[in-house]
C-alpha cells in the first residue's frame, strides 16, 4: 500500500502572512507549549503567538493566494519577535482516512525507503504546482530545488519536505521551509518550521525549537 501519497494527498502549504499580535519585549526565557496534547515544543518567551482569529485569517489569505481550499486552520502559529519575523513555527492536525499509523509508515519505509521518497517527491511536484503559481502572482518565488527525507522528529517518524522561497518581507532573502508530516492514526500532525537562510540567530532559534519537539 502506497502510504506516502495518502499522507501527502491533503498537502498543506505554509502561508506565512505577517499577521501578528503586538507584544511587549520580555527577557528571553522559554515557554513550553502543548498543542492538543499531541505535540509539545518550546519557544522563546518573547515570540508572538497568533490567536485563533489570526490563524483563521492566515488560512483565508492562503486560499486567496493560490485559489484552492485549505482543509484546516493551524492549531498553533508562532513567530520570532520583532517583526518581520525571522523564524516561524506552525502546527496543524489534519484528518486521515483511512488512518495511517506510525507502524504502517515504518513498515513501508523498511520495505522500500527509496520508493517512499520517490512517491513523496512525485506527490509534492503534483500538489505544489498550483501553490507556486498562486504565490508567483504575489511576487513569491521558489528558490532552489526541494529535497525529501524520512527522519525521526520528536520520537516519531516523519515524511519531510524542504524547500526555499523568497521572503515576503525582503525578496532578496530566502526563507527555508521544512514540513514534517507525521501520521498518528486517524490524523497527521503537520509541523512547519521556517527561518531566513544565513541568519545565524534565526538558525539557532530554529535548531533549538526543533530539538524541543515531542510528539505523542
Residue ranges and their predicted role:
Residues 1-11:
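Bacterial N-terminal signal peptides that target proteins for export
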Residues 10-19:
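Bacterial N-terminal signal peptides
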Residues 25-75:
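N-terminal "mature-domain start" segment
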Residues 36, 117, 121, 174, ...:
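Solvent-exposed, acidic/flexible segments
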Residues 38, 42, 130, 204-208:
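Extracytoplasmic/secreted proteins, especially bacterial periplasmic and envelope-associated proteins
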Residues 47, 185-216:
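Surface-exposed amphipathic alpha-helical segments
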Amino acid at each position: 500500500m502506497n502510504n506516502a501519497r495518502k499522507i501527502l494527498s491533503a498537502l498543506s502549504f505554509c502561508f506565512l502572512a505577517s499577521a501578528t499580535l503586538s507584544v511587549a519585549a520580555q527577557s528571553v526565557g522559554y515557554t513550553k507549549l502543548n498543542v492538543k496534547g499531541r505535540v509539545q515544543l518550546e519557544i522563546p518567551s518573547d515570540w508572538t503567538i497568533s490567536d485563533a482569529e489570526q490563524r483563521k485569517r492566515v488560512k483565508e489569505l492562503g486560499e486567496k493566494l493560490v485559489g484552492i481550499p485549505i482543509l484546516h486552520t493551524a492549531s498553533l502559529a508562532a513567530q520570532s519577535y520583532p517583526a518581520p519575523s525571522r523564524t516561524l513555527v506552525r502546527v496543524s492536525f489534519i484528518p486521515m482516512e483511512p488512518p495511517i499509523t506510525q507502524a504502517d509508515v515504518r513498515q513501508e519505509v523498511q520495505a522500500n525507503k527509496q520508493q517512499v521518497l520517490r512517491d513523496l517527491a512525485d506527490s509534492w511536484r503534483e500538489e505544489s504546482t498550483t501553490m507556486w503559481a498562486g504565490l508567483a502572482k504575489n511576487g513569491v518565488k521558489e528558490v532552489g530545488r526541494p529535497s525529501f527525507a524520512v527522519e525521526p522528529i520528536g520520537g516519531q517518524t516523519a515524511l519531510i519536505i524542504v524547500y526555499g522561497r523568497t521572503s515576503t518581507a525582503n525578496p532578496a532573502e530566502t526563507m527555508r521551509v521544512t514540513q514534517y508530516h507525521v501520521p498518528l492514526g486517524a490524523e497527521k500532525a503537520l509541523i512547519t518550521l521556517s527561518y531566513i537562510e544565513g541568519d545565524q540567530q534565526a538558525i539557532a532559534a530554529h535548531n533549538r525549537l526543533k530539538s524541543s519537539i515531542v510528539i505523542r
